[in-house]
């Protein structure tokens, strides 16, 4: 994923 630690809800809602 992009950033990984970033956990951007906008790009990765599944990570949030």
From Swiss-Prot:
It comes from the Eukaryota. Its main location: secreted. It is found in: Secreted. The keyword Disulfide bond applies. Its EC number is 3.4.21.-. GO terms for molecular function: serine-type peptidase activity; toxin activity. GO terms for cellular component: extracellular region. The keyword Protease applies. Keywords: Disulfide bond, Hemostasis impairing toxin, Hydrolase, Protease, Secreted, Serine protease, Toxin. Snake venom serine protease that may act in the hemostasis system of the prey. This is Vipera russelli proteinase RVV-V homolog 1.
């Amino acid at each position: 994923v992009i950033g990984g630690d970033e956990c951007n809800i906008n790009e990765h809602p599944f990570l949030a």
